[in-house]
Amino acid sequence: MRIALGIEYDGSGYFGWQRQAEVDSVQGQLEQALSKVANEPISLFCAGRTDAGVHATGQVVHFETNAIRNEGAWTLGVNANLPDNIAVRWAKEVDDSFHARFSATARRYRYVIYNHNFRPGILRHGVSHYHGDIDADKMHVAAQALLGEQDFTSFRAVQCQSKTPFRNVHSVKVTRQGMYVIVDISANAFLHHMVRNIVGSLLEIGLGNQPLTWMADLLALKDRNQAAATAKPNGLYLVDVTYPEQYQLPKLALGPLFMLD
């Protein structure tokens, strides 16, 4: 049978999602815990491979198993075998047409900036600290240039392996909640480092170092070297993955937990 899981994790202690030899990964920890519950080797497929230090509240994975277990085994049972910074939020049996990556129609990320003169002691791994007076409204206006299907060469990592730089951004908004500035962006898919590169350039606009038209200018240039530095990983969360209604996957609060949803 095929099982889908909703996963939440604090990525600060891991070398990213993907299983790697000799370093700790989210995938490695999950596969180990699932294999114990299933009493057989389990291999996972995920909706989005997050980088080192990046978190998720809405990661979706699937796996094949011959084990017959109830929902509690795949949630509470697996959680009992996981470290405290990884948790299964839900489990659902799905048909064989479902694939965590290829069935997804959109991914949604939130980037959380703690905008204060002094660095935080609490939540330091869950937010990115930037001082200076950030104008979230200017960032929001500038970000609207990203909407639609476009060439995002200026915002892809040099080592990105995607065959095409084109992605379709469905929505993007920048808001402020007190000391937090949140960049919320949804697209059909994302290039390597695309969200963090976008945030890095939006910050330059929010800090008054670049004009409102800069995002549009960067898109036209198609040159990564012209954009700003990549934003830090610790403020980034994969918060949601969209699938066709036929799969009826659970929908929970997006998070992260300390934010207004």
Swiss-Prot record:
GO molecular function, one term: tRNA pseudouridine(38-40) synthase activity
Alphabetical list of Gene3D superfamilies matching this protein: Pseudouridine synthase I, catalytic domain, C-terminal subdomain, Pseudouridine synthase I, catalytic domain, N-terminal subdomain
Intrachain S-S bonds: none
The reaction(s) this protein catalyses: uridine(38/39/40) in tRNA = pseudouridine(38/39/40) in tRNA
Keyword Secreted: no
EC number, UniProt record: 5.4.99.12
Record keywords, A-Z: Isomerase, tRNA processing
Residues given in the record as substrate binding sites: Y109
Active site: D51 (nucleophile)
Highest taxon above the source species: Bacteria
BP GO annotations: tRNA pseudouridine synthesis
Biological role stated in the UniProt entry: Formation of pseudouridine at positions 38, 39 and 40 in the anticodon stem and loop of transfer RNAs.
Complexes and interactors: Homodimer.
Family: Belongs to the tRNA pseudouridine synthase TruA family.
Protein name as catalogued: tRNA pseudouridine synthase A
Organism: Shewanella sp. (strain MR-4)
Organism phylogeny: Bacteria, Pseudomonadati, Pseudomonadota, Gammaproteobacteria, Alteromonadales
